[in-house]
Amino acid sequence: MQRYLPWFRVADPQASAQMTVRHLLNQTSGLPYFPSAAALADFDDSPGAIVRQVRALSTLKIKSPVGTKFAYSNLNFNILGLIVETTSGEPYADFVQKHIFDPLEMRHSYSTTADAKRDGLAVGHRHWFSLPFPEPDIPIPAGSLPSGQLISCAEDMAHYLIANLNGGRYGDLQILSEAGIAELQRGAAEWREMGMLVGYYGMGWVSQEIGKVRVVSHGGNVPNFSAFMGLVPEQKRGVILLLNADPYGLPAITEEIGMGVTALLAGQPPAPIKLDFIQWIMRLLPLIPLLQVVGVFATLRVLRRWEREPAICPGGGRLWGQHILLPLFPNLTLAGILVYMRSTGVIYFVDLFMPDLAWIARISGSFAGIWAILRTALILRLARKSG
C-alpha cells in the first residue's frame, strides 16, 4: 500500500509496510472499528479531509496482525478512497461521478446533502428511546465519504445491481470486467461472530449460502438512514432496501428484511425475525438517572437517621462493606463506562447513532463519579463523628 501512499503509517512500522490494497478491500488489514466511527463525527469538509484523517492514523494500534483475520473497519474504505484520489488525480466524489454515477445513469445520486436535498432527499430520522425523530441536517463527514456517505435512490441503485448481476455490463457499457465482478463476489475472509461462521467477506460483499443457493449482500447505515443490497448471482436477481432512519433504536430490521427478501428471490423461505429486546432496553434507559436520584434521597435519609441516633451508625466491616464498598461498585461502573467511551472515541459513535444512550452515559456517568466521592466522604465524616 505504501507504493501508493509512501508516507502511510500506523503505530507498528512493520504492519504499515505489510498492508496491501487487497487487505483493505477484504477487511483483513487489522485496523480497528471504533476509530473509524469517531471519524464520522469529524465534519471538517475543507479540501484534504480524507488525507488528514488517514495521516492521523500514525499512532493507531492495529487490532490483529495484518492479513490474519477479518475485522470490519470503515478506515479501510477511507484509505482506499485516498488511494483512488492519489492515483487518479481527482477528488473522490468527482471520480465516483465520472466512473460510476454517469455510466450507470445514476442521475439521482450525490456526494453532498445539499445537492440531494435539491432533488427531494427524504427526511432522515434518529431514534431517541426507540422513538423516531426527524434529523434532516446531519452533514456528511467529507473525510469518511468513501466509507458509505454517498446518497442514492432505489432506481439508481437498481442500475448498480444490474451491472453487478450482468458481469459488469450496463446497457452497452462494460463498467468492470466479468472476471472483476466474479472476484468482487467471491468472498475471501471468514466472517465469524461468537466463533460461528457467518459467511465470507471480500471487496465489499458478504458471500453466504441460503439453503444451497449462494447469495451476496452488504448492509450499512449512517446516523439517519440505513440501506441493504442483496444479490442472487446465479439467478440474476437482486434487492435494494433504503430506510430513512437509523436502525440502532430498533431490532436490525433493515438487514433482516433485506435478507428475508433475498432468501425469497433465491427460492428459499426467509428466516424468522428474531425476538429483539433492544428497543425495550432503550426505552428503559431514563430509569438509570431516575434510580440514581432515588438512591441519593435514600442515602440522605439514612445519614439523617445516623446523625439523630449515633448509636445505630454501623462500624467496622459492616460500614465499609455494606455502606461504602458495595454502593461504590455501580457508581464506579457507570463512571468507568463514561471514561472508557471518552478515551476510546466510542462516545463519538454513540453521539451520532445512539444519542439517547450518549446523554444517559454522560449524565449518569458524571453524576455517579461525583456522587461516589461525595457519598463516601459524607459517610466517613458521620462515622467519625459518631464514634
Annotated model-derived regions:
Residues 13, 17, 45-49, 68, ...:
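Residue-level signature of the cytosolic catalytic core of signaling kinases
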Residues 1-4, 17-21, 46, 50-53, ...:
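Stable alpha-helical elements in mature extracytoplasmic
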Residues 2-3, 41-65, 90-107, 127-136:
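Short, charged, amphipathic alpha-helices and their helix-cap/turn boundaries
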Residues 90, 97-98, 138-387:
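Catalytic loop of the DD-peptidase/beta-lactamase superfamily, centered on the K-T-G motif
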Residues 77-85, 236:
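Active-site SXXK
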Residues 1-36, 59, 82, 86-124, ...:
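Active-site helix/loop module of the DD-peptidase/beta-lactamase fold
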Residues 9-14, 38-44, 65-69, 83-86, ...:
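Second-shell loop/turn segments in exported
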Residues 36-40, 69-70, 113-114, 196-200:
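Short coil/turn segments at secondary-structure boundaries
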